[in-house]
Every structure is written in structure tokens, then in C-alpha cells.
Design a protein with these regions (language model features):
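N-terminal nucleotide-binding beta1-loop-alpha1 segment
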Residues: 1-22, 251-254
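Conserved beta-strand segments of alpha/beta enzyme cores
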Residues: 27, 73-75, 152, 213-215
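Short catalytic helix/loop segments, enriched in acidic residues and glycine
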Residues: 23-38
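Conserved core of the sugar-phosphate nucleotidyltransferase
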Residues: 112-192
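Short beta-strand-to-loop acidic/aromatic patch adjacent to the donor-nucleotide binding site
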Residues: 100-110
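Left-handed beta-helix
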Residues: 1-2, 147-149, 180-183, 187-256
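Conserved N-terminal catalytic core of the sugar/cofactor nucleotidyltransferase
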Residues: 1-8, 34-102, 193-195
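Short beta-strand/turn micro-motifs composed of small residues
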Residues: 10, 56, 106, 130-131
Length: 256
């Protein structure tokens, strides 16, 4: 298996979480017995991904405690500019000096094991995971073009009417980068941040897709959720997490 480094983007301030976000980084919120990041790490390790890197910013000391007490082999990289620059800058902090392939994850996600399998299924190609409709609110829609029988990334937007053609699905928040893709992002990313310091990582992936194909595997019925506010947290706890827990129990790599 290709040695893949998992990079969590965990620097954000969690403003929309209100008081909860001011007290705790979103990646360290929990629904089940472990935090979102710890849940994700367990799933990654079950799939053979043991190299974990977390890009911190807001409430970084909480991640230092996590690494010291429960994830001692995780590498922490601090983004001191988390309040003034967007997630593309955090991604570049995570990718600095990296020569191998990486799996990029948003830290405020819960997801079932199939997500990891799908996004790293073809290690020779960069890949952005897509789901069917969730109705979760705040969706990011993905448009794709057909290239040699593969749906490949064209654009992303929260505006479902951005393109006249139907979107391919919804962004999940797991993106696999080949070694070549890492090199290209490290080349084009700094200029994008210089032009717009608040650039998000999604814009970097769209720019990457203009230089090489980024395939968009889709799982229509994937159990997953992003948690940006209290309403999304309640939805994830009531409707999504029970499906994820059930999927883990029956999964051949994670079942007990």
C-alpha cells in the first residue's frame, strides 16, 4: 500500500458554533465516545494510514493535550495566521516539505469507513469524495466533467445554480492528493494566498484540477456530516451518527 499522510485542517475558529466553538475546537467536539478527530484517526488507522498530521490554530493548546494524552504519534503544525488567512494557507502549512501523497480531511466531520476506501481507491490519481444529497444545509456542490469515463472535478460552489448543468454531488471533505498534486499545490497555492489571504482550500483544489485530473468518486448513500453550528450538530447526532456507528460495527476492518 502507498504510504499516505493524513492531514487534518483544524485551525478554524468555529465562529458559527457560538459559545461551544469559543470553548472547544470543532474537531474536538464529540457525539460518540471520542472526538471527531479521534474517530477519524481510528478509521484511518483501520485502513492502514498511520501517519497523522494536524494543522492547528484556534485553541491550539487543546490539540497539544490531545497529542500528549491520546494521540502521541500525531504531528502538530501550528498556523499562527489562522485568524487572518483562510484554509488554503492552513493546507500549505500542512503540506510544507511534503513529498509524498496525502489525504486531506476537514476536522469537523463524522463519516463511515466507506469514505476512506473510496477516496484512496486509485492511489495514482488525485481524488475528491462526493456524496448524494444530504439536505444538511450549507452544502458545497461539486461539478464534474467526464474524462475517459471518469467524473473529474470542474468546479465547487455553495450556489447550486452556479452552472446550468446539474452538479455531480456534494463535497464531503476528504481529498486525496498524489505526490505530484502536492507539488503542484505547493507551487500554485502561495500565489493564490498572496492574492486573497482568505482563500479556502477548495479553491486550491479547483485550481489544481485545472492542471491535472481530480477524479470525483461518489457514494450516493454515504453516512457523513459536517458540523458547523448547533443545528448541524443536532442533525449529526440524531440522524447520521447512528448510521456511522452501525457501519463501523459491520465493517470488516473495524467491526468488533
Amino acid at each position: 500500500m502507498v504510504d499516505i499522510t493524513a492531514i487534518f485542517l483544524a485551525a478554524g475558529r468555529g465562529v458559527r458554533m457560538g459559545e461551544r466553538g469559543r470553548m472547544t475546537p470543532k474537531g474536538l467536539l464529540s457525539i460518540g465516545p471520542a472526538s471527531f478527530v479521534e474517530d477519524a484517526v481510528a478509521t484511518l488507522r483501520a485502513h492502514g494510514l498511520s501517519s497523522i498530521r494536524i494543522v492547528t490554530g484556534h485553541l491550539a493548546d487543546h490539540y497539544k493535550t490531545l497529542a500528549r494524552e491520546r494521540l502521541p504519534d500525531a504531528e502538530l503544525r501550528h498556523n499562527p495566521d489562522f485568524a487572518d488567512k483562510g484554509s488554503l494557507h492552513s493546507l500549505l502549512v500542512g503540506l510544507k516539505g511534503e513529498a509524498g501523497p496525502c489525504l486531506l480531511l476537514e476536522s469537523d466531520l463524522v463519516f463511515e469507513p466507506r469514505a476512506v476506501e473510496a477516496v484512496i481507491a486509485d492511489p495514482a490519481r488525485a481524488s475528491l469524495l462526493v456524496s448524494g444529497p444530504t439536505g444538511a444545509g450549507d452544502e458545497v456542490y461539486v461539478w464534474a466533467d467526464d474524462r475517459a469515463g471518469k467524473a473529474c472535478l470542474k468546479d465547487m460552489s455553495k450556489d447550486a445554480a452556479r452552472w446550468p448543468t446539474p452538479h455531480h454531488g456534494e463535497l464531503v471533505g476528504l481529498t486525496y492528493l498524489t505526490a505530484d498534486a502536492v507539488t503542484r499545490l505547493n507551487t500554485i497555492g502561495p500565489g493564490m494566498v498572496a492574492q486573497d489571504p482568505m482563500s479556502d482550500y477548495e479553491s486550491g483544489i479547483v485550481a489544481l484540477a485545472g492542471t491535472e485530473p481530480v477524479i470525483c468518486p461518489k457514494i450516493d448513500d454515504l453516512a457523513w456530516a459536517e458540523v458547523d453550528n448547533e443545528t448541524m450538530l443536532a442533525r449529526a447526532a440524531e440522524l447520521v451518527y447512528p448510521r456511522i456507528a452501525a457501519a463501523r460495527k459491520t465493517h470488516p476492518l473495524m467491526g468488533t
